[in-house]
Amino acid sequence: MRHTTLILIGLFWGTFLFSQSSKPNIILVLADDLGYGDLSCYGSKRIQTPNIDAMAKEGLRFTQFYASSAVCTPTRVGILTGQYPLRFNVSTHFNDRVMFLDNDVLTIPKQLKTQGYRSMHIGKWHLGGLNEAHISDRKNSMPGPLQHGFDHYLAMIEDPQYRGVAMREKRLYKDAGKHLAKDDTILPEDSRHWTNIKFDEAIKFVKSASKSNQPFFLNLWLDAPHAPYEYSNDEALAPYQKRSQGQDLLYRGMVTHIDQGVGKLIETLKALNIDQNTLVIFTSDNGPAYLGSPLHFKGRKTDFHEGGVRVPMIAWMPKTIKRDQTTDVISNTVDFLPTFGSFAKAKGAKVITDGMDLSSVLKGKANTLDRPTMFWEISTRYANSGNYVNVTDVRMTPVANQIALNKQWKLLAIEGDPKELYNLEKDPYERWNLLELKPEIATKMAKELKAFLDAPRKEKPY
C-alpha cells in the first residue's frame, strides 16, 4: 500500500511539473520614450535595429498599438493592472517619495503566480516605494515591486538625490550602478552601463529560471532611450559617426544599444532551447520626447495626438506566432494582463480589466476584435507644457488632455469638452478635424467619455 501511495504521489508530482513546464515563459521588454519611427522595421531610415527587426521578421508587428498614456507612470500602471490608469486616479508622473500604486490590486505577476510562475522585475519602476527610506523600512512604508507580486527585482533607488541629480548632470546611465537595490537590499556599487546591467541581469535570470520546471515572467523596463542622452558603446555609435553628431548621435546609439541587448536576450533563449516556449513582447511606454521620431504622426510625448500614444509593438514566439506578420488590430498596453493570463491558462475568478485578450490575434486565429471605446486622460499640466514639441509638430493650444477612441473614430477633449474629431482610418496623421462635420459622432463619444470620467475610482495614490 505504501509503495502504491508513493507511486501515485510520484505520478501526480510528475504530472504537476509537466503542466508547469508546458506553460510558456513570458518576457516583456519596455523601452522608455521610444518613438513609433525609431525602429528600422517601423520605417526609420536614421537608426539601425537589426535584432529587433529580426524579431518582427520572425513574429508579429502591430501597426495600431497604443500606450495607455502619453507619459511614463500611467502607462506602467496600465501595464501591470490591465486597467486604465485613471481608475486609480493616475494621470501624471508620480512623486515617488509620497505617491504609490496600492498593492491591493491584481497585477500581472500576482496573476501569473497563481499559475506557478516565478517572476522578476528589472529596471525602471516609477510606481512608488523605491526611495531609500521605503526600502529600509518596508513594513512601515509604501509597497514596492515585491509587494506587487514580483519574486525578485533589480532597480535603481529613486531618491531625487540619486536619480534626479544623475539625470540633470547627464550621467544617469553611467552612475545608476552606484545606487541599486535588489529584493529590498541595497547593493554595492556597479560600474557597468545601466543598460548593460539590466540585460546582463535579465539573461542571468533567464538562465537560472530555465533550469527549473517552473515557467517564468520577466518584466524588463529599460530607461533608454529616455534623456539624458549619454554614451552607449563604440559599436552602437559606429553606424552614425559620419552623418551625425552631438545629442542626435548619442540618441541613435542608445536605441542601437537596446537592439544589441535584445539580440543577446533572444540568442540566450535559442541557446537554452526555450525560444519556442517563450513569448517575447517589445514595446514603448509612450511616444518620443525630444530627439525620437513619431514617423509621420502628429505630436509626441505628453501629447494625445497619435505620435504621443501610438507606439511600436512586436510579439515573438516561434511556431506559435507565424513569421513576418503585421496586424492593424487596435490594441493597448492594458491588454497584456488578460493576454498573458490566457497564455498561462489562468483560471478562477473573473479578472477586472479594461484590456482584451490578444492571444487569438497573436496566434493568427483572429484579425479583428470587437473592442469597446478606449479612454485616456493626462494631467493638463503635462498636456499643456509643450516640453517635447519640435518645429515639425502642429499642436492646438491648449492641448487636449482626454481621448475617446472607438474603431476609426478618435475624439480629443479638454476636461470633457470636445475639441477635435478624426477618422483615423482615412486620416491617421490627424490633418482634418471633423468635429463640426460629424457632430452626432462627437456628441455620442463625448457622452461615453463623460460616463467614464464620472465612474467611481480609487482615491488618489498617496
Language-model features: locations:
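Conserved, charged catalytic cores of large soluble enzymes
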Residues: 422
